[in-house]
Curated annotation (Swiss-Prot):
Keywords: Glycoprotein, Ion transport, Membrane, Transmembrane, Transmembrane helix, Transport. It comes from Homo sapiens (Human). PANTHER family: SOLUTE CARRIER FAMILY 22 MEMBER. Residues 1-62, 169-193 are annotated as: Disordered. The gene is SLC22A23. This is Solute carrier family 22 member 23. The lineage of its organism: Eukaryota, Metazoa, Chordata, Craniata, Vertebrata.
Length: 686
């Protein structure tokens, strides 16, 4: 009776509602039955667990809370990684390997498109036609610093209003003996003088990106029209952002394959039309739609690649696709030098997507998505197609996947939209944390890139366009190689935390320590000089670019793993759109002539500190089965970053540990004496 009174005081008496779900992500027993673990752990390295099924009722029948699970499909069919994928041979099947290879090949074409702005919109040296190239050195010019560097954002350009007059003057004076018609160096002009210097009817250009003509030189996007270059950069990024959000939702509703194929068709239409643009307005508008379609291709291929792989192979197969895209980045300068004209380059970038039209006949729908959305009739046909391609005997179905599938053929499909995540307890928090991480990583990358390239006058190596380009590409390559090693030993959450700490340290040291060095450098006896400050700044910038690239890439991959299959494309769309917003800060700062850059850096530095705390709230998904529905995703609970010591009891007990305590009430009602040390919550530890 004492136990009954304690139960009623705790809210368990008659007429009372059951307690809400626990804070660590577990659901009440009624909901847990419908979302039981599908295969449990797939490997020893994970920290997140999906809660097991509730036990049978002591009377022999089903537990009362299991009644809601009567309408649910067979758990064998929802256990894709534990039942369906092994039946198909895992990644060992020849057909699965072919499909993975088909997701790698387009990454090269995607790399070409992502890095094309560095060449199409590079701001060249320019001077008034007829005045001779020497006029360029007299300050009637602007020297751009390249367009988009890397798949993050565009590197800063020096607008005309802030052109380096002193450096140009030194070059002009030194070359005055050779060029007798070179006019004397004017004093740094004010705003009105810049307008008069731009009063020219025709321009000559010195393009540094391997092309004879690009978008800037074709339509004279200099001086008063220079802002249109940044709008053109906006158009592709804004198209990517909207594309990620919209195509992600559509792919969860109609499937990955239709979105992929329609995106291929329309990127061919819009991409080839870009090369036929008659003015910069048409160019920018078509680039928006090109970015929209490119987002659909990137997102669906990423999801298909994840859903094809078993737990132990997901990360490495994703990284191979990243390396293929980087190969496109490294090959772009040679492609530009081969084409010579921006229209030919644009057409050559888009034409390889013609090969992807063959995917309509050779690339199937995601079997994992068909099973998760209960489209069992289509799933059965696809399973038989897989067994035929792999030359497998369907009679080798030990677990009985095909018989269970035939029992569920009459079930109606159950599709889910990403907006359903708003009603969850843990899943929406995980997605928001990863969106903020992605936004911070991609956004602060521009701060580090601008800081490093801002020393190009003092570092001769960085004055060259190709040196800038390949330096950024090499940092990204080294970052991906480091990710492979770190994630292998520390897992997804540990690796993300390490790279975010490095990003925060590089940012804070660059903002704080360099200002301190700058103060000491004013004293001649301090031993500090501006060269020391510049070297520290370049070092911190390289470390920051290295770490922030890993943060952004790992956040996207992490989101793809912890988001359930039924809304995976929608979740990926959110985190990729956040990355796009981070990239968008670069052309915004450039459009305002670098005004607000320091505040921009401070804001992102503060975000890194917030992200370090929030990363600890994420689950660990290494070697875990992918969640198939929203209930599975809710059961990915956060665990301590370091494992428990042997014999140490965790503070928060799971449902699996609490389920055996229900017999205490029956024992007390029967008048049995409780053993010594028994309590209402179980046995007291001795």
């Amino acid at each position: 009776m004492a136990i009954d009174r304690r139960r009623e005081a705790a809210g368990g008496g008659p007429g009372r509602q059951p307690a809400p779900a626990e804070e660590n992500g577990s659901l009440p027993p009624g909901d847990a039955a419908a979302s039981a673990p599908l295969g449990g752990r797939a490997g020893p390295g994970g920290g997140a667990e999906i809660q097991p099924l509730p036990p049978l009722h002591p009377g022999g029948g089903p537990h009362p809370s299991c009644c809601s699970a009567a309408a649910a499909p067979s758990l064998l069919l929802l256990d894709y990684d534990g039942s369906v994928l092994p039946f198909l041979g895992g990644l060992g099947g020849g057909y699965q390997k072919t499909l993975v290879l088909l997701t790698w090949i387009p990454a090269l074409f995607i790399g070409f498109s992502q890095f094309s702005d560095s060449f199409l919109l590079d701001q060249p040296n320019f001077w008034c036609r007829g005045a001779g190239k020497g006029t360029e050195l007299a300050g009637v010019t602007t020297t751009g610093r390249g367009g988009d560097m890397g798949n993050w954002t565009s590197l800063p350009t020096t607008p005309f209003a802030t052109a380096p007059w002193e450096a140009a003057g030194n070059r002009s004076n030194s070359s005055g003996a050779d060029g007798g018609d070179t006019p004397p160096l004017p004093s740094p002009p004010d705003k009105g003088d810049n307008a008069s210097n731009c009063d020219c009817r025709a321009w000559d250009y010195g393009i540094r990106a391997g092309l004879v003509q690009n978008v800037v030189s074709k339509w004279d996007l200099v001086c008063d029209n220079a802002w249109k270059v940044h709008i053109a950069k906006f158009s592709l990024l804004v198209g990517l952002i909207f594309g990620y959000l919209i195509t992600g939702c559509i792919a969860d509703w109609v499937g990955r394959r239709p979105v992929l194929l329609f995106s291929i068709i329309f990127i061919l239409i819009f991409g080839l039309t870009v090369a036929l643009s008659v003015n910069v307005t048409m160019f920018s508008t078509l680039r928006f739609f090109e970015g929209f379609c490119l987002a659909g291709i990137i997102l669906t291929l990423y999801a298909l690649r994840i859903e094809l792989c078993p737990p132990g192979k997901r990360f490495m197969i994703t990284m191979v696709a990243s390396f293929v895209a980087m190969a496109g980045q490294f090959l772009m300068p040679g492609l530009a030098a081969l084409c010579r004209d921006w229209q030919v380059l644009q057409a050559l970038i888009i034409c390889p997507f013609l090969l992807m039209l063959l995917y309509w006949s050779i690339f199937p729908e995601s079997l994992r998505w068909l099973m998760a959305t209960q489209q069992f009739e289509s799933a059965k046909r696809l399973i038989l197609h897989f067994t035929q391609k792999n030359r497998m005997n369907p009679e080798g179905d030990i677990k009985g996947v095909i018989p269970e599938l035939e029992k569920e053929l009459s079930r109606r499909p159950k599709k889910v939209c990403i907006v359903k995540v708003v009603g969850t307890r843990n899943l929406w928090k995980n997605i928001v944390v990863l969106c903020v991480n992605s936004l911070t990583g991609y956004g602060i990358h521009h701060c580090f890139a601008r800081s490093m390239m801002g020393h190009e006058v003092k570092v001769p190596l960085l004055e060259n366009f190709y040196a800038d380009y390949y330096t950024t590409a090499s940092i990204a390559l080294v970052s991906c190689l480091a990710m492979c090693v770190v994630v292998r030993f520390l897992g997804r959450r540990g690796g993300l935390l390490l790279f975010m700490i490095l990003t925060a340290l590089a940012s804070l040291l660059q903002l704080g320590l360099l200002n301190l060095i700058g103060k000491y450098s004013q004293h001649p006896d301090s031993g500090m000089s501006d060269s020391v400050k510049d070297k520290f700044s370049i070092a911190f910038s390289i470390v920051g670019m290295f770490a922030s690239h890993a943060v952004g890439s790992l956040s996207v991959f992490f989101c793809a793993e912890i988001t359930p299959t039924v809304i995976r494309c929608g979740g990926l769309g959110l985190v990729l759109a956040s990355a796009g917003f981070g990239m968008l800060t670069a052309p915004i700062i450039e459009l305002h002539n670098q005004k607000g850059y320091f505040l921009h850096h401070i804001i992102f530095a503060c975000c890194t500190l917030i992200c370090i705390i929030c990363i600890l709230l994420l689950p660990e998904s290494r070697d875990q089965n992918l969640p198939e529905n929203i209930s599975n995703g809710e059961h990915y609970t956060r665990q301590p970053l370091l494992p428990h010591k042997k014999g140490e009891q965790p503070l928060l007990l799971t449902n699996a540990e609490l389920k055996d305590y229900s017999g205490l009430h029956d024992a007390a009602a029967a008048g049995d004496t409780l053993p010594e040390g028994a309590t209402a919550n179980g046995m007291k530890a001795m």
